[in-house]
């Protein structure tokens, strides 16, 4: 009898396990699971990008088959020369798409099929490309550029899959139990003769359609005041190993350093959690026995004025623990799914949770938040009902609540479509994998990712190039210049006792305010569709700076010893291409000439023919292209990386130039008069208005 009972138990247990596995939705997310060739209803009609219609930049499916959660379409591509596929990297047994974290990477190809082959070299410091991705840029055989991007609907998400035969499939799904219904947005498409216009026009169309985004252009957003100043972050110095005493000691060391750090960002390591799930918005009591009070008491208007805190969008890395100390009314805004508590299911409940979340941080005294792990919020909901809508509501609630409370927001690990297309108010997002001290190949890859991803993300936010060490002996100075020209936040992560002033002071004025470009730096046209770590060529980026200049950095990012020396160049065309970065009336009239100012050598020359430069090893060269008008070319304060951003041109005539100097130092001005040319150096001992005569 016992044996029969045991057999029945085994059979019953087997039925239970099998039933549980069958009951699990195919989109339920877990580490190591991939979604390649996911089961989908194949639509008969293909999406033909050869018949692109400019008046319809966002394609919608008007006739969704009944009772279907996932559809797939064959995409017919026009003839192309080369392209970029934007997807995360793929590691066995690791998290996969759509948890893109900070890893939406630009994978270069001549044929899409290359991305599926083991021989594909990829980007150093990363694994092979994921064949599931969010965007595609093609240089077409007819000279045009085509940009295609996945979109999120009310409760649907699309994505691309590169197939082993080199074809492209588009998927669209609810990512859960719900069925697709109504008009479903499929993808965004733009074509243009200009690669910059392809991106600009695409995002204009995206922003204009509230069914697929909740966005504003970067230029229409308010940049949070704190991020205009130099900061310091705990992460790369301590990683998780932080506590109250260490942070207070570091604040003392920062103030003693003489470097005007104006904000401190307390990164991960403070969160009360159980098994990487949030248990309280009060910090770990062992590490922070007095809460945040003693640290907040250190804020001073003319020293460290602002303090920010790291948190995860979904609570902590794996969500919210059932063993939490939230008030009963907040407990009611959460529901249990797949081993975690999640905000929802209704929009009102999600808003209520994030109101409590953000107001609690505000009450603690924090001025801004770095909200990380955003791309993992969607996977936490996957396989359930209203997956995309709930994940999107989390992003929107974060935007609403930080905006309403007057708190700044830095978005991090926020590179899936739901995240990127719903930054309604926030103006800063991380654009690359973490920077690592003393890691040359990682630094090269970091720069490549940051600038290329800015082509997309820079349409709606300022790019955060991550923190850096001024004391990095491999690339501290080079990284400082990249942070300057990025236009995003600049924050250190050295031990304050190791600050290298020579790599910091050229970034800022005496108060710690950063000299920033007018728009984020992006690759020059010839650098967009190449992998500079493998090309054997130079890599160039540029940004508009000051009232009328274009600043350019030329890099050698090659990893092969055979390409230790490469040639680069500066030419007049670079200045005129600058107006394609940001539509501006500043470039409406042609200059009389262009001055190329070599920041390293502190020399200037009229740029007539192309200027050739030799780049030895992992290095960079910074130039400012300044227009000559009425015999004047304004370069700016020579000691600062972005010299043109240090002055404002108030007026000029053939005889006089009037400027407003934003900092002290040596002002460089090019002067032409009576057939003579002069690079004039003028000491500036106080800020304000200055008149210069020829």
Spans of model-derived segments:
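N-terminal accessory beta-strand-rich subdomains and adjacent acidic, glycine-rich linkers
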Residues: 25-208
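Solvent-exposed beta-hairpin/edge-strand motifs
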Residues: 80-92, 575-601, 670-683
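Bacterial Sec-dependent N-terminal signal peptides
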Residues: 1-25
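Glycan-recognition surfaces
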Residues: 317-363, 396-503, 519-531, 536
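C-terminal beta-strand-rich structural cap/linker in extracellular carbohydrate-active enzymes
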Residues: 607-647, 667, 676-694
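Carbohydrate-binding surface patches
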Residues: 483-486, 491, 530-592, 622-629, ...
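Flexible loop/turn segments at secondary-structure boundaries
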Residues: 238-242, 271-275, 314-320, 376-380, ...
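Aromatic-lined carbohydrate-binding/catalytic grooves of carbohydrate-active enzymes
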Residues: 223-387
């Amino acid at each position: 009898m016992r044996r029969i009972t045991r057999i029945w138990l085994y059979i019953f247990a087997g039925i239970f396990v099998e039933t549980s596995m069958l009951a699990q939705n195919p989109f339920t997310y877990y580490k190591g699971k991939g979604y390649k060739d996911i089961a989908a209803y194949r639509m008969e009609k293909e999406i033909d990008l050869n018949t692109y219609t400019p008046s319809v930049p966002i394609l919608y499916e008007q006739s969704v088959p009944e009772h279907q959660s996932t559809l797939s379409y064959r995409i017919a591509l026009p003839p192309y020369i080369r392209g970029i596929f934007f997807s995360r990297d793929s590691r066995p047994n690791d998290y996969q798409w759509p948890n893109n974290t900070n890893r939406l990477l630009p994978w270069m190809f001549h044929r899409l099929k290359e991305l599926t082959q083991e021989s594909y070299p990829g980007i150093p410091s990363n694994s092979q490309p994921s064949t599931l991705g969010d965007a595609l840029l093609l240089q077409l055989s007819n000279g045009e550029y085509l940009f295609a991007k996945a979109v999120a609907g009310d409760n649907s998400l699309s994505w691309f899959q590169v197939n082993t035969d080199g074809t492209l499939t588009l998927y669209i799904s609810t990512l859960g139990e719900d069925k697709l219904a109504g008009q479903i947005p499929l993808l965004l498409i733009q074509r243009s003769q200009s690669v910059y216009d392809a991106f600009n026009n695409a995002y204009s169309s995206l922003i204009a359609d509230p069914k697929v985004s909740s966005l504003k252009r970067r230029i229409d957003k308010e940049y949070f005041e704190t991020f205009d100043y130099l900061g310091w972050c705990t992460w790369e110095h301590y990683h998780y190993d932080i506590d109250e005493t260490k942070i207070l000691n570091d604040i003392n060391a920062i103030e003693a350093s003489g470097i005007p750090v104006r904000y401190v960002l307390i990164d991960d390591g403070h969160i009360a959690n159980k098994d990487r799930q949030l248990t309280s918005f009060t910090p770990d009591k062992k590490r922070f026995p007095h809460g945040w009070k003693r640290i907040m008491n250190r804020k001073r208007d003319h020293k460290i004025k602002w303090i920010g805190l790291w948190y995860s969008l979904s609570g902590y890395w794996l969500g919210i623990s059932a063993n939490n100390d939230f008030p009963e009314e907040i407990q009611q805004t959460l529901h249990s799914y797949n081993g975690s508590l999640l905000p929802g299911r209704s929009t009102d409940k999600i808003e209520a949770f994030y109101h409590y979340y953000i107001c609690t941080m505000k009450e603690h005294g924090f001025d801004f938040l770095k909200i990380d792990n955003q791309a993992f919020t969607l996977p936490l909901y996957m396989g359930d009902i209203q997956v995309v809508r709930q994940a999107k509501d989390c992003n929107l609630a974060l935007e609403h609540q930080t905006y309403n409370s007057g708190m700044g927001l830095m978005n991090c690990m926020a590179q899936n479509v739901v995240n990127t297309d719903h930054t309604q108010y926030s103006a800063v997002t991380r654009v690359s994998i973490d920077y690592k001290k003393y890691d040359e190949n990682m630094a090269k890859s970091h720069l490549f990712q940051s600038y290329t991803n800015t082509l997309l993300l820079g349409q709606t936010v300022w790019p955060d190039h991550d923190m850096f060490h001024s004391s990095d002996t491999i690339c501290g100075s080079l990284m400082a210049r990249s942070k300057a020209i990025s236009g995003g936040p600049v924050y250190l992560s050295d031990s304050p006792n190791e600050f290298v002033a020579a790599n910091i002071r050229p970034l800022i004025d005496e108060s710690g305010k950063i000299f920033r470009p007018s728009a984020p730096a992006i690759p020059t046209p010839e650098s967009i569709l190449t992998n500079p770590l493998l090309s054997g060529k130079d890599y160039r980026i540029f940004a508009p700076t000051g009232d009328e200049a274009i600043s350019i950095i030329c890099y050698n990012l090659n990893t092969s010893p055979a390409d230790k020396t490469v040639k680069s160049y500066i030419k007049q065309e670079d200045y005129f291409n600058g107006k394609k970065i940001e539509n501006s009336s500043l470039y409406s009239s042609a200059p009389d000439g262009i001055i190329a100012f070599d920041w390293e050598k502190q020399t200037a020359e009229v740029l007539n023919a192309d200027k050739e430069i030799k780049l030895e090893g992992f290095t960079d060269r910074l130039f400012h292209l300044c227009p000559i008008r009425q015999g004047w070319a304004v370069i700016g304060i020579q000691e600062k990386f972005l010299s043109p951003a240090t002055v404002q041109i108030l007026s000029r005539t053939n005889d006089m130039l009037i400027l407003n100097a934003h900092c002290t130092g040596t002002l460089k001005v090019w002067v032409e008069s009576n057939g003579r040319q002069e690079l004039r150096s003028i000491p500036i001992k106080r800020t304000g208005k200055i008149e210069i005569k020829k």
